[in-house]
């Protein structure tokens, strides 16, 4: 029973005293000696001391660790506040009294808060620095300098603001560079469109990221890319300038050849894309394909083709202009020698010593001068036409007056009667017409310092001959009238003495058609020659008839050419050989 209680000492309340009491009871039962008991008690005491000693050592060690932890926490707190630079924003206890654990408990919340801030600040620094490093690598051309390291000794907001300002500057620089790259790419695109070049291959040769399929933010903005883009743009602009210069030269040649060869508008429209830029500046040429090589080659082929046709076409155009010049002279009744002029034009073109443009320009100048001269002669020529028309009417009137049947009731007689009335009025103005024409002609000759010729004959000579013939006609009429009076005077006296006798029937002359002038003997004989021939053949009666039929101005023109002793010839409008 005692053994069982000894083996279960923990059944009751266990203390050192109860244990010692139990030990005494056991020794009493066993019969241990006092020496043995003292020895055992001493051993127990030593073992208790060792236990206490170990506990003290453990407690001391724990205290030291707590002190070290407190010290480390204090240092960490100091370092964090220094690194973050935000001591004023953290509730940090200043007192050093109280137990170690109390001090640790007081520091722990501030330390935890600073650790959180540090982690957030490190992430912010890491994010900013990574963006800065990325942009710097893009500007440097994609050089990777390795992962960035955040300096945790200085995590202050001031330093973070500095990094953020630097990031903003780099972002602005990146934006500016990207904008510049896009401008370069757009310029390259426009130039390639005008020159009809492959835009994609052109920009990808500079950098693969410049392909339009790639996003804007992925395009290279490095110094090398910008430099190569600038060089590409410069090369394309020089190419554009050279092509435009070549195209304008071809356009000028085409225009000259067209003007030279009088090319139709339909043929010219085929090369509007060439001539439309003949005076354009480089920046004004923006149409797609306007300076393509194939268009320039087409223009070159057309210029070569026109050059080959130029000689034959030149002769055709020159003769056409010569015909125009001859027509102007013909309308102005100016006599030239067209055969000689055409031969000289042919020889000049075949020799090739004269530029076609100069030749045609000279002919155009002659045409302009001919038109001016024709215009200056117009008033006189109009008066000449009126004079000739009046003379024709006078000739018709004389034929009409000699017609014995003019008052008959034949068909159209009333029309001839009206015409005769108008003709008499017109004939009465002929003298004034001639006088005015002479005055106008003399004034023209004084103004132009040259003789006024009509179909190669001086007009004043024609008018003088006409005036002379008209005066002879008037004199002849007066002479015949006086002669007739003298012949009729004896008959009048005889009739008054013995009475009148019926005269034999007057022979009826052959009926002549009225309205057509009859100049028996031909229109091309000179009045003086015709008068001379008629006088020799028919005597005074023929001479009288010739004077009554005054020569028309057209006959005077033809005959004055033959009879003029010193005709005034007009210089042929022939281009001077260079």
From Swiss-Prot:
Q: Where is this region: Disordered?
A: 473-578
Establish whether keyword Repressor is in the entry: no
Asked whether the UniProt record includes Phosphoprotein among its keywords, one would answer: yes
Primary subcellular site in the record, as a coarse category: nucleus
Q: Which InterPro entries match?
A: MAP65_Ase1_PRC1
Q: Where is the composition biased (Basic and acidic residues)?
A: 473-494
Question: Where does the record place the modification Phosphoserine?
Answer: 503, 532, 566, 569, 577
GO cellular component terms, alphabetically, are: cortical microtubule; cytosol; microtubule; mitotic spindle; mitotic spindle midzone; nucleus; phragmoplast; preprophase band
Question: Biased-composition ranges for Polar residues?
Answer: 549-558
Q: Which domain of life is it from?
A: Eukaryota
**Which parts of the sequence are marked as the site Microtubule binding?**
409, 420
Any single Pfam family the record assigns to this protein: MAP65_ASE1
Described function = Microtubule-associated protein that stabilize microtubules (MT). Involved in the regulation of MT organization and dynamics. Confers MT resistance to the drug propyzamide and cold conditions.
Q: Which family does it belong to?
A: Belongs to the MAP65/ASE1 family.
- Which protein, by its recorded name, is this? 65-kDa microtubule-associated protein 2
Its source organism is Arabidopsis thaliana
Q: What is the lineage of its organism?
A: Eukaryota, Viridiplantae, Streptophyta, Embryophyta, Tracheophyta
